[in-house]
Regions:
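Active-site-adjacent bridging/hinge elements
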Residues: 46-58
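Active-site-proximal helix-loop elements at catalytic-domain edges
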Residues: 19-46
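A generic signature of intrinsically disordered, low-complexity regions enriched in glycine/proline
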Residues: 27, 37, 41-42, 60-63, ...
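Predominantly the structural core of cysteine protease catalytic domains
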Residues: 2-5, 10-19, 25, 51-53, ...
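Active-site-adjacent structural elements in enzyme catalytic domains
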Residues: 58-106, 120-138
């Protein structure tokens, strides 16, 4: 009598993750920042406003992009996730136009306070959220056609022309929103997206296998700083917009639990234009 064949169940291998550079540095001198309270007292933020139970700023024109294997997260979080939304809403940009993440990224690296040695040309060397916001406040932002991300070409015109163009899209101010989740909801509901920093952990790395849900932050597994944006919230989650393409998370987005958001996001900034 023939013995029954022993069957083995094959495990489905997870696709290999793309290697990402994580180089967003903590912002310096945050104790000097204007705060949510300052914004409220100056009537930029509505401290006593009724906060809706949910808010979703996502829209079809605001597409997810991919920084690839570069260390440009600060450029993408500031130009593509924060400034672009505001300038489209204020009529300074059409829905089909992109801002240059490369300008925000390179200008931040060139002007940040991390100057023990020249590092603008070193891919893995990063910069901070606050430096990018200072670039946007002092110099402004340019469209991607002036300094394209994909080609790496330099601007061939005069510096005065470049910065005159950038000056058309300056921000007026930025505000440090701290780690108060109620203030975050208030800002998202009444003022727009928030740029945040986190140290990427294993939960973040697994977002493509959890439908984008970020439930529990694992500080023991962190491996470097990253800049992204909050673009909405529900009763128990914050909607996160990344720059790792649509294959990450839920088509480029993630949903951070309140506990995860409180533990993971070490900085949060909103702007006025």
């Amino acid at each position: 009598m023939a013995r029954p064949r022993k069957t083995t169940r094959r495990r489905t291998a997870r696709p290999r993750r793309q290697k990402r550079i994580l180089n967003c540095k903590p912002s310096p001198k945050t104790e000097d920042d204007w705060t949510f309270d300052d914004a409220a007292k100056s009537e930029i933020a509505a401290a006593t406003a009724t906060i809706p139970t949910s808010k979703d700023l996502r829209t079809t024109w605001w597409t997810i992009n991919d920084q690839g294997s570069t260390g440009s997260c600060v450029g993408w979080a500031s130009a593509d996730s924060l400034l672009r939304w505001h300038f489209v809403k204020s009529g300074k940009l059409t829905t089909s136009q992109l801002l240059s993440p490369r300008f925000m990224w390179m200008a931040s690296k060139e002007t940040d306070p991390f100057v023990t040695r020249p590092t603008t040309f070193i891919e893995t060397e990063g910069t901070s959220l606050k430096t990018a916001l200072d670039v946007a406040r002092k110099f402004g932002a340019v469209r991607d056609t002036y300094l394209p991300f994909a080609t790496g070409k330099l601007y061939a015109g005069k510096a005065s022309t470049f910065y005159a163009t950038a000056a058309l899209r300056k921000i007026l101010a930025y505000f440090n929103l701290g780690t108060n989740l109620t203030d975050w909801r208030n800002w998202l509901a009444n003022n727009g997206p928030i740029m945040v920093r986190l140290d990427v952990d294993s939960t973040w790395d697994d977002a493509s296998f959890t439908g984008g849900n970020l439930d529990t932050y694992n500080p023991a597994s962190t491996r470097g700083g990253h800049a992204v944006a909050l673009v909405g919230y529900t009763a128990d989650r914050f909607i996160v917009r990344n720059s790792w393409g649509t294959s990450w998370g839920d088509k480029g987005f993630a949903y951070a639990s309140l506990d995860y958001a409180q533990a993971a996001f070490t900085e949060a900034y909103g702007i006025q234009v």
